[in-house]
Amino acid sequence: METTVRKQKKNLEMKKPSIYSLQLHEMQDWLKEQGEPKFRAGQIFDWLYKKRVKNYEDMSNLSKGLRDKLSNSFDITTLNTLVKQTSSDGTIKFLFQLYDGYSIETVLMRHEYGNSICVTTQVGCRIGCTFCASTLGGLKRNLEAGEIVAQVVEVQRALDETEERVSSLVVMGIGEPFDNYDNLMGFLRIINHEKGLHIGARHMTVSTSGIIPKIYKFAEEDLQINFAISLHAPNSELRSKLMPINRAYKLPDLMEAIKYYVNRTGRRITFEYGLFGGENDQVEHAEELAALLKGVKCHVNLIPVNYVPERDYVRTPREQIFLFEKTLKDRGVNVTIRREQGHDIDAACGQLRAKERKEETR
């Protein structure tokens, strides 16, 4: 059963940088420029990420002079919640308004092991996957690091009401994370830091459609973050049909980058494989996929796709999903079927935002 809470849009105007975009060392540098001791950075982070205050006046252990400097330099407002949809399984989807009127989606998913959040990195997407609602309308702009951080802060504030916490996160919302690489990395470091929300690196997952140069760069980062590839096809011809990015970053080159990442980090990689009825879900596709992944330290996550009205793809029948899984397992592939959540709300990535855009143009 769906429960929806809808609020009015606000006139938001952010002329100053978001304070949520600053890493701890950047806050320390700013304080030094202001003639303030750098230990104040830890106090400020405590107010932002532990107490989660909404204004500078509540930072009672800071001098009024420092609070004024912060107010004059950084915006502390986060996001305006436009829509909050709650599913019968506890999944909550948020539609947040940004300062310039654009909207983004964030999803809270409840598991036996804790609460997971799926965050967005861009307003729209330029990748053009033919099955995805996120790319409808194209890319509007990148999110700043602080706008990605603010999604987690806002969801955590909602969980504070029931004394729960965000225990893990996936960067699989609207947009291509590696298309906004610097802001992505700033976000991850803020969220991971012990003075931030302190979500462990191994409890975070970043997914990419396959921007190869950034895969090599990501392999050199010092964060032990889980890594996933949106694959969705076992060969170049089919992948190019489903994901036009494959024409720029071809599958053989992508597999080489993935092998480099696995060898460089020693970490297992996850391949996301959405199943589209009659397109990529036959036994021969599973056999071809097993051959493609042979020798790669990996896990395959099979995704029964959500129906998107603007797209032509249909869901693979349940029996066919199990057959596809069995075919992979019989060939030694580590595979699971992703548990569906939020099926009774607009839980497919980009659906709620697309619906909101339609209502605005009526």
Swiss-Prot record:
Cofactor or coenzyme needed: [4Fe-4S] cluster
Record key words, sorted: 4Fe-4S, Cytoplasm, Disulfide bond, Iron, Iron-sulfur, Metal-binding, Methyltransferase, rRNA processing, S-adenosyl-L-methionine, Transferase, tRNA processing
Annotated positions binding S-adenosyl-L-methionine: G175, E176, S207, S230, L231, H232, N306
Annotated ranges, domain Radical SAM core: 111-344
CC cofactor note: Binds 1 [4Fe-4S] cluster. The cluster is coordinated with 3 cysteines and an exchangeable S-adenosyl-L-methionine.
Active site per database record: E105 (proton acceptor), C349 (s-methylcysteine intermediate)
Family the UniProt entry places it in: Belongs to the radical SAM superfamily. RlmN family.
Protein name per Swiss-Prot or TrEMBL: Probable dual-specificity RNA methyltransferase RlmN
Organism: Bacillus cereus (strain B4264)
Gene name of the encoded protein: rlmN
